[in-house]
């Protein structure tokens, strides 16, 4: 009875959570009765803690609504339910067997058409050891991406395969790829982990064709334990490369070997890539990495300054973070310039000093992002008239874009709420605040709004 109740609860959670949240946290759970207690089994400690912290109240409330005082007690455990014949999550990848001529430190490399790279005992991993989960600054914009990456590192080839991360340039996708690779290697030094840009895969295939070594190419890429490919959108219109990757993809998944892909856009929006590939990209878990919000931008600056041995005043970090919003790479580049100028001149890092050091960059940002620019961009995106943005019309087709534009104005400009309200037809600041809160809520609940907002930020920040 209680297990059946859990199935009903799953239906409720699927309605209330986003597809990403449901796939990451609820789908991996298994349920079984133990006396008067319903035990929920999570695949690992990370999932267990997250579900217990975030969703236990929703679950208990549903049980009480359905069964009142007869509702079962709830307990969490790690693993699979004892009666399960098979685990719901595939077993972790087995380490690749290596020949006696190879070192145990074999991890990954790029393809070499002259000889199979695995025959070289001295080749090194191309996973960057400096990219770790510990130095990845987490915020709302990348929380799901980091959580998924952590689980893949702990259980490669398991729950989320393939993992597809998408978002604009400089948001931390590559950092997460390397962090996963480092996590896999830490747990299994014999694992063969390969990271590369999609253009390198294409180059390797072309060289293999030129050197009559296509079989070696296939053997190498289909033998890895984990394959991470950055910027998969560069496969567009490269038919032979897509054909080879299609078969490589299938071979790796059949062997429960982990695949992680990144792109600057949602899989179905990648032009020039075969539908059968785009379909496979969505077989596992697809997660958006969005531009960092203000608090995360500040945290990134403070972490970077700390790593550089620089004391960055809080007010300076906020000043920079409020004005540079597009991506992490831009933030770090700006801070590097400030630090270099401070070291060269010997002057303390103050807001006035930062204004001077980043004069051209700040001027460009202020010129690019204005409320008027946001209104025009949003009106064009949603195909409404600019006049509607300022009107009193309340139909959803107009009100929702107006709310999106208000939220973007708060995030991307330095204008106050009253100033934003004035720019939207003399509206009160409480209307702007309500719009910002409503859009923040919808970005959690609606995939379409989340995508629209991310697309608009990319457009306005480019």
From Swiss-Prot:
One CC-aspect GO term: plasma membrane
UniProt region (Domain III, AAA+ region), positions on chain: 126-342
InterPro entries: AAA+_ATPase, Chromosome_initiator_DnaA, Chromosome_initiator_DnaA-like, Chromosome_initiator_DnaA_CS, DnaA_C, DnaA_dom, DnaA_N_dom, DnaA_N_sf
GO annotation terms (biological process): DNA replication initiation; regulation of DNA replication
Gene3D superfamilies in UniProt: 1.10.1750.10, 1.10.8.60, 3.30.300.180, P-loop containing nucleotide triphosphate hydrolases (3.40.50.300)
Coiled-coil spans in chain: none
Protein's UniProt keywords contain Nucleotide-binding: yes
Keyword Cytoplasm part of the UniProt annotation: yes
Residues covered by region (Domain II): 84-125
Domain IV, binds dsDNA: annotated span: 343-462
Region described as Domain I, interacts with DnaA modulators: 1-84
Chief location of this protein within or outside the cell: cytoplasm
Top-level taxonomic group: Bacteria
Assigned keywords, A-Z: ATP-binding, Cytoplasm, DNA replication, DNA-binding, Lipid-binding, Nucleotide-binding
GO molecular function, one term: ATP hydrolysis activity
Localization of this protein: Cytoplasm
Binding, ATP: 170, 172-174
Membership in a protein family: Belongs to the DnaA family.
PANTHER family in alphabetical order: CHROMOSOMAL REPLICATION INITIATOR PROTEIN DNAA (PTHR30050:SF2)
Role this protein plays: Plays an essential role in the initiation and regulation of chromosomal replication. ATP-DnaA binds to the origin of replication (oriC) to initiate formation of the DNA replication initiation complex once per cell cycle. Binds the DnaA box (a 9 base pair repeat at the origin) and separates the double-stranded (ds)DNA. Forms a right-handed helical filament on oriC DNA; dsDNA binds to the exterior of the filament while single-stranded (ss)DNA is stabiized in the filament's interior.
UniProt subunit comment: Oligomerizes as a right-handed, spiral filament on DNA at oriC.
Domain remark text: Domain I is involved in oligomerization and binding regulators, domain II is flexibile and of varying length in different bacteria, domain III forms the AAA+ region, while domain IV binds dsDNA.
Name of this protein: Chromosomal replication initiator protein DnaA
């Amino acid at each position: 009875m209680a297990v059946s109740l859990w199935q009903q609860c799953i239906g409720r959670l699927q309605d209330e959570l986003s597809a990403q949240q449901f796939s990451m946290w609820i789908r991996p759970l298994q349920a079984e009765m133990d006396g008067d207690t319903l035990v929920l089994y999570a695949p690992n400690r990370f999932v267990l803690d997250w579900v217990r912290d975030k969703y236990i109240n929703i679950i208990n409330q549903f049980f009480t609504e359905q069964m009142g005082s007869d509702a079962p007690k709830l307990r969490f455990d790690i693993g699979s339910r004892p009666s399960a014949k098979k685990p719901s999550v595939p077993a972790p990848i087995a380490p690749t067997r290596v020949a006696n001529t190879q070192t145990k430190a074999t991890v990954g490399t790029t393809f070499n058409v002259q000889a199979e790279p695995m025959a070289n005992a001295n080749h090194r991993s191309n996973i960057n050891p400096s990219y770790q989960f510990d130095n990845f600054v987490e915020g709302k914009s990348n929380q799901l991406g980091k959580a998924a990456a952590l689980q893949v590192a702990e259980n490669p080839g398991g729950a989320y395969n393939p993992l597809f991360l998408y978002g604009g340039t400089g948001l931390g996708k590559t950092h997460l790829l390397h962090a996963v690779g480092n996590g896999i290697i830490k747990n299994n030094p014999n694992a063969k982990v390969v990271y590369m840009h999609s253009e390198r895969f294409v180059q390797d295939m072309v060289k293999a064709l030129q050197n009559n070594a296509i079989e070696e190419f296939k053997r190498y890429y289909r033998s890895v334990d984990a394959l991470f490919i950055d910027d998969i959108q560069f496969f567009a219109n490269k038919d032979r490369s897509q054909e080879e990757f299609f078969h490589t993809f299938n071979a790796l998944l059949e062997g429960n070997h982990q695949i992680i892909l990144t792109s600057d856009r949602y899989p179905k929006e990648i032009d020039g890539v075969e539908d059968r590939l785009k379909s496979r990209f969505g077989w596992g878990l697809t997660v958006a990495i969005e531009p960092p919000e203000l608090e995360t931008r500040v945290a990134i600056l403070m972490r970077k300054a700390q790593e550089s041995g620089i004391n960055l005043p809080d007010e300076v970090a906020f000043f920079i973070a409020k004005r540079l919003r597009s991506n992490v790479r831009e933030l770090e580049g700006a801070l590097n310039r400030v630090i270099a100028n401070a070291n060269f001149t010997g002057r303390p890092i103050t807001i006035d000093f930062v204004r001077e050091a980043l004069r051209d960059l700040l001027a460009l940002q202020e010129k690019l992002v204005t409320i008027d620019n946001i209104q025009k961009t949003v009106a064009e995106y949603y195909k409404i008239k600019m006049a509607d943005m300022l009107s009193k019309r309340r139909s959803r087709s107009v009100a929702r874009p107006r709310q999106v534009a208000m939220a973007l104005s708060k995030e991307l400009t330095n204008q106050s709420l009253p100033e934003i309200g004035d720019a939207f037809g003399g509206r009160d600041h409480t209307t702007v605040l309500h719009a910002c809160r409503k859009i923040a809520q919808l970005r959690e609940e609606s995939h379409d709004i989340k995508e629209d907002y991310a697309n608009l930020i990319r457009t306005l920040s480019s």
